[in-house]
């Protein structure tokens, strides 16, 4: 059977949550036993988001095959079992790159290359390649309906309906129904105008997901259905929720998956939502909390660390804990402002995530030193592993000017330097060590205990590595190199001796990209466990101190 397509579009405003909506639909269909694949088309002209600022685009999600993609692919992988590749994320820039390459080769045989049919055909071909050996392909169109940039993609999905028919294509439109407090009522006009915009392009939506902060009444749903030409049951309340893991359950309650089955004429079992219900139950019924301090360069824009935050949530839920994140600006730890160090004193674990450039590095080193000297559980990822190595070289090995050649090309001690195969390469786009690489772990290490094996594969995104000329000296001082590539070329994991520090681990790869709510990543689960143990020790120590103050001789008899 050929795959059926669900096309997800958005209207009124951006950032309504199309990615989460698409992922939640995919999740529900998988629970019904269907095989699903997910795809995202972004209307910007960049070939990929790899060189875009985290402040503009947010996180860059890396797939096993090394593609640098939109953060929505992270939602897709966390909510479904789809194994995504570069075929699952396309941009206008990449589509045009393909077309121009073909034109230069002469593939178009001298024809005038135009948006229709050449651009739309390229888009449709990409959609069809991602729909092989699956029951349903869910395609999200980025941007907002009405934007000039999105028009070729909207036209392409209109043509897909013409080619494949109504039984094989479904249009899901996410829109906004705002509540106007002054008037005391929900307003449907933005939704009506958004659908009108879609209709003007030739698309009649089949299902409307109405983003709102309260449940839509039967009358409101009826009004939207009447003016937007959809069935009453196809007007769905996409209500704001406190936890994103509620979204699939909310959609199921509203009958979204049932409607998909009906419109696409699919036959499948009822979904088993037990495990998702358990996750949501844990979210709202934790036994305790854990506080993690994240020392980062982009902390004012949390989407820069989307997968990281979710992986910490997954690790916390595995221990039935509520996660509280303290975002610590790395540059703040370079100042004499005591409030930043006060933040460090109140966290149960410290994490330094990935990043690029010199800004904030000194603050990260100060935070890492605090974690090492005060025995606070530490987890360094990518840049966090590199800075941990630099801090150790400086403050334990006595290599005062130790640094990375990225931050100081003239440093006498290049503890971190550019990947050997990238020396002389000046282009930034797609030139890093990307994608899944094998790693061998040392038995008995924190990492090996967490994974339960000594052979793993993790995703990478970096252009600098640990300089093995310093390995022997730093190992003698107490730094353990517990993870390497199978051939020993690259250092992948460093740790402190477990007798010297309860939990101190840095990894060159990005484990957050493989964590899921139902399958928390072992390293995040271990880090949260160590952080909570540290919290318990701190609490007991504080209680003993308070008790000793209360029982001092001068207080007795008062």
UniProtKB/Swiss-Prot annotation:
Name of the molecule in the record: CTP synthase
Q: Which UniProt keywords apply?
A: ATP-binding, Glutamine amidotransferase, Ligase, Magnesium, Metal-binding, Nucleotide-binding, Pyrimidine biosynthesis
| Misc. comment | CTPSs have evolved a hybrid strategy for distinguishing between UTP and CTP. The overlapping regions of the product feedback inhibitory and substrate sites recognize a common feature in both compounds, the triphosphate moiety. To differentiate isosteric substrate and product pyrimidine rings, an additional pocket far from the expected kinase/ligase catalytic site, specifically recognizes the cytosine and ribose portions of the product inhibitor.
Q: What is its EC number?
A: 6.3.4.2
Q: Which Gene3D superfamilies does the protein's record reference?
A: 3.40.50.880, P-loop containing nucleotide triphosphate hydrolases
Domain Glutamine amidotransferase type-1: start-end pairs: 291-537
Cellular component, GO annotation: cytosol
Q: What is the annotated quaternary arrangement, including any partners?
A: Homotetramer.
For the ligand (ATP), the binding residues are 15-20, 72, 239-241
Which biological process annotations from GO are given for this protein? 'de novo' CTP biosynthetic process; pyrimidine nucleobase biosynthetic process
Q: Which residues does the record give as Mg(2+) binding sites? A: 72, 140
Q: Which GO terms describe its molecular function?
A: ATP binding; CTP synthase activity; glutaminase activity; identical protein binding; metal ion binding
Under the heading InterPro entries, the entry gives: Class_I_gatase-like, CTP_synthase, CTP_synthase_N, GATASE, GATase1_CTP_Synthase, P-loop_NTPase
UniProt xrefs under PROSITE patterns: GATASE_TYPE_1
Residues given in the record as L-glutamine binding sites: 355, 383-386, 406, 463
* Gene that encodes the chain: pyrG
State where UTP binds: 14, 187-192, 223
Q: Which organism is it from?
A: Koribacter versatilis (strain Ellin345)
């Amino acid at each position: 059977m050929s795959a059926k397509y669900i096309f997800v579009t958005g209207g009124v405003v951006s950032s309504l949550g199309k990615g989460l909506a698409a992922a939640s639909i995919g999740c529900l269909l998988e629970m019904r036993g269907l095989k699903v694949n997910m795809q995202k088309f972004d209307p910007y002209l960049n070939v990929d988001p790899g060189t875009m600022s985290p402040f503009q685009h947010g996180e860059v999600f890396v797939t096993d095959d090394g593609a640098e993609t939109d953060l929505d692919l992270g939602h897709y992988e966390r909510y479904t079992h789809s194994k995504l590749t570069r075929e699952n994320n396309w941009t206008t820039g990449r589509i045009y790159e393909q077309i121009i390459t073909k034109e230069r080769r002469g593939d178009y045989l001298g024809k005038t290359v135009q948006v229709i049919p050449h651009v739309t055909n390229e888009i449709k071909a990409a959609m069809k390649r991602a729909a092989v050996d699956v029951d349903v392909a869910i395609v999200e169109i980025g941007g907002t309906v009405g934007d000039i940039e999105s028009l070729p993609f909207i036209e392409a999905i209109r043509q897909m309906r013409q080619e494949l028919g109504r039984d094989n294509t479904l249009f899901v439109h996410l829109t906004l129904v705002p509540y106007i407090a002054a008037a005391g009522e929900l307003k449907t006009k933005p939704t009506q105008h958004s659908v009108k915009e879609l209709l003007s392009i030739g698309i009649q939506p089949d299902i409307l997901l109405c983003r709102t902060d309260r449940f839509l009444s039967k009358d409101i749903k009826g009004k939207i259905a009447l003016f937007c030409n959809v069935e009453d049951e196809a007007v769905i309340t996409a209500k704001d929720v406190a936890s994103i893991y509620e979204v699939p359950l909310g959609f199921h309650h509203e009958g979204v998956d049932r409607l998909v089955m009906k419109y696409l004429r699919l036959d499948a079992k009822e979904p088993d939502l037990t495990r998702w219900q358990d996750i949501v139950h844990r979210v709202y019924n934790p036994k305790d909390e854990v506080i993690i301090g994240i020392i980062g360069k982009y902390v004012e824009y949390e989407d820069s660390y989307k997968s990281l935050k979710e992986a910490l949530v997954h690790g916390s839920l595995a221990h039935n804990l509520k996660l509280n994140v303290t975002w610590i600006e790395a540059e703040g730890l370079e100042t004499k402002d005591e409030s930043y160090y006060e933040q460090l004193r109140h966290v149960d674990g410290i994490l330094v995530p990935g990043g690029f450039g010199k800004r904030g590095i000194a603050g990260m080193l100060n935070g890492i030193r605090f974690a090492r000297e005060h025995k606070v559980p530490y987890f360094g990822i990518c840049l966090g592993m590199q800075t941990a190595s630099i801090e150790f070289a400086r403050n334990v090995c006595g290599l005062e000017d130790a640094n990375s050649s990225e931050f100081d090309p003239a440093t006498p001690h290049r503890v971190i330097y550019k990947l050997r195969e990238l020396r002389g390469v000046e282009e930034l786009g797609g030139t890093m060590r990307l994608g899944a690489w094998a790693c061998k772990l040392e038995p008995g290490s924190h990492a090996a205990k967490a994974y339960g094996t000594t052979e793993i594969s993790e995703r990478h995104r970096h252009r600098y590595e640990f300089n093995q000329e310093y390995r022997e000296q730093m190992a003698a001082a107490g730094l353990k190199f517990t993870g390497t590539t199978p051939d020993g070329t690259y250092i992948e994991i460093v740790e402190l001796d477990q007798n010297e520090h309860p939990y101190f681990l840095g990894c060159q790869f990005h484990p957050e990209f493989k964590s899921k709510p139902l399958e928390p990543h072992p390293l995040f689960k271990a880090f949260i466990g160590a952080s909570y143990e540290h919290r318990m020790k701190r609490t007991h120590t504080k209680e003993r101190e308070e008790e000793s103050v209360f029982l001092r001789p001068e207080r007795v008899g008062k």
